[in-house]
């Protein structure tokens, strides 16, 4: 054996034993509540081609050749390589965020004109997203309209009623028009072509993160930046921050820089916090007092206890039980999670995940690299989480595109055009010369052309201060809600559960402000365990044990801005807390501050023989009895349709009540049938409905004085 042979063997052994160690595979987990698509590429393609008008059937059986023609059509429309194959470029386009209006064909809800036949177009912002301050949303929509008015003779006027030509709405999932949104990303918004009713309206998916295209917009308070919004990311002591922070402070107050580099510019402000101010409520915007006592229990943070609508609130004195003063806690878009199973909650830092502590958003555990956080201090035990905010979608750009549809424009196949169906962020005016030619073909040029509105430039720092961020010792927040204080009910700060968290009593609309002077009410409903009585655009609230005097009047338009002044009936569905309002042949559905509708009664399965719904009685299992035309139907809240076979005369189930009742409602688990000023109360014993009381609505229910 050669003397070198042992050395060779030794080297081989050494080389074998010193091979590079394997890299540790990342731990991937299935996050609870996350919707995971199981669609194959073909299923995705079939669904996409059907949704956007390229095929007329949702599922196409056969081999890949059956997709060839619709794929060629799609590729031509989207300016993709025309291969007729389901290639990577086509699949990538199908997964891109986009407008929900079909590329081929139109929404078929109503017959609509191709254009408006008047030039002064009105619009109404029916509700708002919580992602942006309201003034920022107002400005984004105004600038989007200004793009089109700059190149046409059209003018756009904001109004505050449903009579507007274009009604703007934020909604989620199925929101009342038959064209549901699909959750975060994907379908961003849609709009209808000009015409009456829902035609011309623009709807935005409120499960998206709406921004100005560069990340969340967080206003600041105090500091030295005059209320300028946070700049994310920003640098502080050499470290980059993508959210408000408490670093550098001993008082725990969250702050941010309003320029890209605090170390250089020294411009800052404090982020929205309940320690700075509260919203609405009855405490005139005063900050929270921690700890505070509610129903004998001590709270050191905002809570949703005592509320059915999920709004976070706090007391503004040490004892809510004693002082009854409260406000609603502001939210911060930079730390409010999107999706997951805790949408709308705040990130909690630090949090524990797989035994390790995290002080910022992380992509650990995820295959797609998306940043997420826990909304409690321990994900391992609580499994509560959501995605951290990303750059979001520019509300201005998406609105400008949707308003193009509302004016009569179709999608374009030119990727550079504003009317191209896919979303892309860009600076400056998004109007392409092809967009201008299209809109001027419909309306002509602007006889007095002016440059379109541009984004207000970010304020530039002046002389940098010499001190680090300090808490203003004496001043209070300079801005707080303008609504008048409202007395909190004795059971806790509930307020109307559907609109902005509180509704303030309004100035009287006529001398008959006293509810006891109303002879016959338009509608009566139990909402949030309180009886609500409606009349001529106003309503009063009444609860047994709250001083036995109704609160109000309140304006319907302030609490539920989408509703008409005259209502026929209303009810709250016990399981989902959805509110249904009926007026004439239309219905509106409120979920929190979001509204679906108006929808026609035909959509529920009620034909023209039912001129209006006169009342409703919720039943178990998501069922409701709807009344109208002296008959009743069983209504399924989930499908929002009536069982057409269930129509039966009222006296068949409720013997002894008048047939020509104008309102039917449920209160304290009993049914009430109203005729003129009187009611017939029905209780159920041994599955038999019996009238057990006849009385006056004013005297026997509202406890008005008999004088």
Curated annotation (Swiss-Prot):
Ca(2+) 1 binds at residues 131, 206, 208. Ca(2+) 3 binds at residues 182-183, 185, 187, 205, 208. Its main location: secreted. GO terms for biological process: collagen catabolic process; extracellular matrix organization; proteolysis. N- and O-glycosylated. A motif (Cysteine switch) lies at residues 97-104. It is an enzyme of class 3 (hydrolase). Matrix metalloproteinase that plays an essential role in local proteolysis of the extracellular matrix and in leukocyte migration. Could play a role in bone osteoclastic resorption. Cleaves KiSS1 at a Gly-|-Leu bond. Cleaves NINJ1 to generate the Secreted ninjurin-1 form. Cleaves type IV and type V collagen into large C-terminal three quarter fragments and shorter N-terminal one quarter fragments. Degrades fibronectin but not laminin or Pz-peptide. Ca(2+) 2 binds at residues 165, 197, 199, 201. Glycans are attached at residues 88, 120, 127. Residues 225-273, 283-331, 342-390 form the Fibronectin type-II domain. One of its GO terms (molecular function) is metalloendopeptidase activity. Residues 437-508 are annotated as: Disordered. Residues 481-493 have a biased composition (Low complexity). CDD domains: FN2, HX, ZnMc_MMP. Gene3D superfamilies: Collagenase (Catalytic Domain), Fibronectin, type II, collagen-binding, Hemopexin-like domain. Its EC number is 3.4.24.35. Residues 1-19 form the signal peptide. This is Matrix metalloproteinase-9. GO terms for cellular component: extracellular matrix; extracellular space. Zn(2+) 1 binds at residues 175, 177, 190, 203. Keywords: Calcium, Collagen degradation, Disulfide bond, Extracellular matrix, Glycoprotein, Hydrolase, Metal-binding, Metalloprotease, Protease, Repeat, Secreted, Signal, Zinc, Zymogen. The lineage of its organism: Eukaryota, Metazoa, Chordata, Craniata, Vertebrata. The conserved cysteine present in the cysteine-switch motif binds the catalytic zinc ion, thus inhibiting the enzyme. The dissociation of the cysteine from the zinc ion upon the activation-peptide release activates the enzyme. Its cofactor is Zn(2+); Ca(2+). Residues 20-106 form a propeptide. Residues 446-467 have a biased composition (Pro residues).
């Amino acid at each position: 054996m050669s003397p070198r042979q042992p050395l060779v063997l030794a080297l081989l052994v050494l080389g074998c034993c010193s091979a590079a160690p394997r890299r540790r595979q990342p731990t991937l987990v299935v996050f609870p509540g996350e919707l995971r698509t199981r669609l194959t590429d073909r299923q995705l393609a079939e669904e996409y081609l059907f949704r956007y008008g390229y095929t007329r059937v949702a599922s196409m059986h056969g081999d890949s050749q059956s997709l060839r023609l619709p794929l060629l059509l799609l590729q031509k429309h989207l300016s993709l390589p025309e291969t007729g194959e389901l290639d990577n470029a086509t699949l990538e386009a199908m997964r891109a965020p986009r407008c929900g209006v079909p590329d081929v064909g139109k929404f078929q809800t109503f017959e609509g004109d191709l254009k408006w036949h008047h030039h002064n177009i009105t619009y109404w912002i029916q509700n708002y997203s919580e992602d942006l301050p309201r003034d920022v949303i107002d400005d984004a929509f105004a600038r989007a309209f200004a793009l089109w008015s700059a190149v046409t003779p059209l003018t756009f006027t904001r109004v505050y009623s449903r009579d507007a030509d274009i009604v703007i709405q934020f909604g989620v999932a199925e929101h009342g028009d038959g064209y549901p949104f699909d959750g975060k990303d994907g379908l961003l918004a849609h709009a209808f072509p000009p015409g009456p009713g829902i035609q011309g309206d623009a709807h935005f998916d409120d499960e998206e993160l709406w921004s100005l295209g560069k990340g969340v917009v967080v206003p600041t308070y105090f500091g030295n930046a005059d209320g300028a919004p946070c700049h994310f990311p920003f640098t502080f002591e050499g470290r980059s921050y993508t959210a408000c922070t408490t670093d550098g402070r001993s008082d725990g107050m969250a702050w941010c820089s309003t320029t890209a580099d605090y170390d250089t510019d020294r411009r800052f402000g404090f982020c929205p916090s309940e320690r700075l101010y509260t919203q609405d409520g009855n405490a005139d915007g005063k900050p929270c007092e921690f700890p505070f006592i509610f129903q004998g229990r001590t709270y050191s943070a905002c809570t949703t206890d005592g509320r059915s609508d999920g709004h976070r609130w706090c007391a503004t004195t040490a004892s809510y039980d004693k002082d009854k003063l409260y406000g609603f806690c502001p939210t911060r878009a930079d730390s409010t999670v999107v999706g997951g199973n805790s949408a709308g909650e705040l990130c909690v830092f630090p949090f524990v995940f797989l035994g390790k502590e995290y002080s910022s958003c992380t992509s650990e555990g995820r295959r797609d690299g998306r940043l997420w956080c826990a909304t409690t201090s321990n994900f391992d035990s609580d499994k509560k989480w959501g995605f951290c905010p990303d750059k979001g979608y520019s509300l201005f750009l998406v609105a400008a595109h949707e308003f193009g549809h509302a004016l009569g424009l179709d999608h374009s196949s030119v990727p550079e055009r504003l009317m191209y169906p896919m979303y892309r962020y860009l600076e400056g005016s998004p109007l392409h010369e092809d967009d201008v030619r299209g809109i001027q073909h419909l309306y002509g040029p602007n006889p007095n052309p002016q440059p379109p509105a541009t984004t207000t430039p970010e304020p530039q720092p002046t002389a940098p201060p010499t001190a680090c961020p300090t808490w203003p010792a004496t001043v209070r927040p300079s801005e707080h809600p303008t609504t008048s204080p409202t007395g909190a009910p004795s059971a806790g700060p509930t307020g109307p559960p559907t609109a902005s968290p509180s509704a303030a009593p309004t100035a009287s609309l006529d001398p008959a402000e006293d509810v006891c002077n109303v002879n016959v009410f338009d509608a009566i409903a139990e909402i949030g365990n309180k009886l609500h009585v409606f009349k001529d655009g106003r309503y009063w609230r009444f609860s047994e044990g709250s001083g036995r005097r109704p609160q109000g009047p309140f304006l319907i338009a302030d609490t539920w801005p989408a509703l008409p002044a005259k209502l026929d009936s209303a009810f709250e569905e016990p399981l989902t807390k959805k509110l249904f309002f009926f007026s004439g042949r239309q219905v509106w559905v409120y979920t929190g501050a979001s509204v679906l509708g108006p929808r026609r009664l035909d959509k529920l399965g009620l034909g023209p023989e039912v001129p209006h719904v006169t009342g409703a009685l919720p039943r178990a299992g998501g069922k409701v009895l709807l009344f109208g035309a002296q008959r009743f139907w069983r209504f399924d809240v989930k499908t929002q349709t009536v069982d057409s076979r269930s129509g039966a005369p009222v006296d068949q189930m409720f013997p002894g009540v008048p047939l020509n009742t104008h309102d039917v409602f449920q209160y304290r688990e009993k049914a009430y049938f109203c005729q003129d000023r009187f009611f017939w109360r029905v209780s159920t014993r041994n599955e038999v409905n019996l009238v057990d009381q006849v009385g006056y609505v004013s005297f026997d229910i509202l406890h008005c004085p008999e004088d």
